[in-house]
Amino acid sequence: MDIIKSSFDKRQSVQKNYDLIAEQYSNEFGTYIEDLDVYEKFEQHLVENAKILDLGAGSGRTYSYFNKQNYEYIGLDFSKKMKDCAYNLHGKFPYIVDDMVNVKRYFSNNSLDAVFAVYSLFHLPKNDFNNLFSDVYDILKVNGLFLFTNQIGQGEDMADEPYLNEKGKNSLYMCYHTNEEINDLLHSFPYTELFKKQKIEISP
């Protein structure tokens, strides 16, 4: 019970903080596509009319890319205020407000062509992170695609978030994973790696 309660509290703190900064975040990132080459490479492997789930959809920047194509896009995020920002920017589209750990409440096994999780999974505590890989594997169709980002490191901490500083707070829960941990996790399922990109950011 302690682990579940602890994990819930950490996820809930992230949700509350994103509600606080939703408008500022949306203004800066609502239509901004970083690493466009990754999106394009991912798209090369998508089937026609693919059904895509975006875990941690935020203010809809992934929707702003895939809406231009003939795909069935569904967003999922635990921040109601992020959903409101997404609708203000892009108009209404399928968007579920809930914690991504509950994804199997909404999708049956073998029902999705692709799952997209960019800049979101590193807010999950390690046990939830690992369990999500199992859930995603279940809901993907055979030869389905899973694109995700990871913050390389070890352990967990409360990372500085400038937007929160403006709200009288200053940190956001983060959980890190080494490349070895990710590889072990992928190999514990029959996931096949198609491509990866590693970015190294050097602070001044």
Residue ranges, per PLM feature:
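Class I SAM-dependent methyltransferase SAM/SAH-binding core
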Residues: 59-103
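Conserved class I S-adenosyl-L-methionine
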Residues: 1-47, 49-56, 154
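Conserved S-adenosyl-L-methionine
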Residues: 191-202
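Acceptor-substrate binding/catalytic loop of class I
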Residues: 163-180
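A short acidic, Gly/Pro-enriched loop at the edge of an enzyme's catalytic core
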Residues: 106-115
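A short glycine-rich, Lys/Arg-flanked "PGG" loop and its adjoining helix->strand segment in the class I
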Residues: 130-142
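Conserved beta-strand signature within the Rossmann-like core of class I S-adenosyl-L-methionine
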Residues: 143-150
